[in-house]
Amino acid sequence: MTIIDPDLNNHFINSLIKKHQEGGIYPMWDLASNYTGTMIGYHAVPVIVDAYMKGYRNFDAKEAYKACLRAAEYDTTGIKCPDLVLPHLMPKAKYYKNAIGYIPCDRENESVAKALEYAYDDWCISIFAEAMSDFESKAKYERFAKAYEFYFDKSIRFMRGLDSKGEWRTPFNPRASTHRSDDYCEGTAWQWTWFVPHDVE
């Protein structure tokens, strides 16, 4: 949107910020202005960071930045949503990411997909942190942005689930997909292995 309609994009961003102020966190796949917790990642972050870095800043950058940091941390306090939605809006995957550095596949469904999306979103936060002169957070989120490396099994050249003991998920079939019950979200290792847009080398 920053290319085709930056003014409309600023309206989107102001709506995202308002949603955070009213509900306690950025939305994930909002439906009829309600939290659903559907899908993964915290992709309000790249929308905001993209606009900010391109100079489209008709929004409260400090409030947006604070909300970006909030989106990346595991903290269920202050979120106004139905109890049924909360575990999806604030999945334990964020806790594992921050506490042990990776998301165990035997503790969280779609662990690889969540980790790869979180890594990209965290990279975006690191860029925003630098722009906001928050160098401590910049270093922290740069480190989180490299978390995708945990999942790359060099022996087979695929992103693959790691269990809570740090061992690869077996058996492994890069073409296998069991909707909502495996290490990937609506895809396979063949598709998800390539999702590292912030570090294509």
Language-model segments: residues:
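Aromatic-rich carbohydrate-recognition surfaces in CAZymes
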Residues: 1-129, 142, 192-200
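Catalytic cores of carbohydrate-active enzymes
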Residues: 27, 126, 131-201
